[in-house]
UniProtKB/Swiss-Prot annotation:
Keywords: Amidation, Amphibian defense peptide, Antibiotic, Antimicrobial, Secreted. The modification Leucine amide is found at L16. Its main location: secreted. Expressed by the dorsal and submental skin glands. GO terms for biological process: defense response to bacterium. Transmembrane segments: none annotated. This is Citropin-1.2. One of its GO terms (cellular component) is extracellular region.
């Protein structure tokens, strides 16, 4: 879902 994509992006950004 849309939230899954948001979480995915948030995880990547948070990993920086």
């Amino acid at each position: 879902g849309l939230f899954d994509i948001i979480k995915k992006v948030a995880s990547v950004v948070g990993g920086l």
